[in-house]
């Protein structure tokens, strides 16, 4: 690639690939990179754009990526900028950032699995951004592929024309050349004046220990050059451009990027707070360009506590979280303390997979062993004085007598299932207190069920349960619809009369008895026996609803007595009883990390 990267705007195409998880986005991206000669056979590997170790390991895309490809047709060289996006519902924020940088989208659907819940959600998101959609049916090489039926499904659910669907096999490369032509013909060229005042959007960033923050940008107006002074409008900071360039797919420096191009900037930014994803970059002068409308800030739906297993690692955990926040601004954290687990952080996530991924990235990238508390959602509570506040952790829920109104978040779930599994899925949604809102037939054998379900019922294992009762064919997508009043309560766990804050949960009153008994029973089997008996109780306010007792270890004090008067034995047993009573009054019950983890990972 030449060092001077700018080119005529009508020869630039910015597009992304959107699809349900596992429909072959990253594999198709690999074929496009090979077909355009962006990577040679030496640099070839599978899932070239998934460069996080976790992405390669789990076979899913977590972070958005950008790569510039050169494609020659009829003697004209086109620049095709592909922005790879994640497919899972938890990474919707990454998808929306990618869509804001594109003019077109390849809507990829598996030729066997057909339209899935996330396909519908991503297609509507692309339509909201006014993107030109190119429908693509992938995996046509499969023995069980049914491209004609899938094209009909796409027409029924998304309104696409079956004749316009491009048919490809990302695995074998069949149909990829025709797809490249379709991108050039269908996706509009970017608009924007290269001579106007610089206006560029920050759509991602990551942190390099040697170079500082590497900022991914899409230039909307004007031109950015090496050595130029630029300003981050939201942060208000001014920096010199030390290096800029494009990804192919590794970094390739160039002298300038013009309106319509996608690339990266390095400004030796060491302060993590200076780069905000969604910020606007302009010239550092008196009249910079106006700020672009930012992305919608993502709402954190799920909260949990993260604590280092070893208290010595607290400052390392804080540094690791700060580094990760530069690259993934969709989660937030604040310090918190727990009597049981010590110092740690309360973290907010977009969903359960997002929480799991962040925890694994922290453990892999910073080598810290973590303990995680039970996930919970954000509740809205109005007290007797009429003051409404958001509650992120169960410990902050006031006593039942102080609550006027207790509201929980409700999500609208779209579940796409084969017809023969509709019954079990409806039963499952009703068990989770769901209210049916719609039932739509998608094709000959599949339907989309729409339910409003409390988010707290979704975050634990609804996705897994849907997969298991549909033999893996059901798919789930959800979006927030608002808050609704419900009969909720805080369930506390008391050990030896003391509340264990890390085990408190908010649950529906009708489910509290079952849940309390299950946790007490599990904890009884995990707590080590002491010299005195330990009571494990589940309580709502001051009312105990379940109790288990861990029996005491006792020494056989009457072993040395043989024959003789019974009063001698009674005297020794009474003395032992009094000693245990004294011990119980002053004794502390240690709950091991293992016991916590057993209860928290039990799904209860």
From Swiss-Prot:
CDD domains linked to this entry: EF4_II, EF4_III, LepA, lepA_C
- Fetch the SMART domains from UniProt: EFG_C
Question: Which topology term describes how it sits in the membrane?
Answer: Peripheral membrane protein
- What is the purpose of this protein? Required for accurate and efficient protein synthesis under certain stress conditions. May act as a fidelity factor of the translation reaction, by catalyzing a one-codon backward translocation of tRNAs on improperly translocated ribosomes. Back-translocation proceeds from a post-translocation (POST) complex to a pre-translocation (PRE) complex, thus giving elongation factor G a second chance to translocate the tRNAs correctly. Binds to ribosomes in a GTP-dependent manner.
Q: Which residues form a coiled coil?
A: none
- Top-rank taxon, per record: Bacteria
Give the family, as the similarity comment puts it.
Belongs to the TRAFAC class translation factor GTPase superfamily. Classic translation factor GTPase family. LepA subfamily.
- What positions does the entry give for GTP binding? 22-27, 138-141
Q: Which GO terms describe its cellular component?
A: plasma membrane
Question: What name appears for this protein in its UniProt entry?
Answer: Elongation factor 4 1
Protein's GO biological process: positive regulation of translation
- Specify the tr-type G domain's residue ranges: 10-191
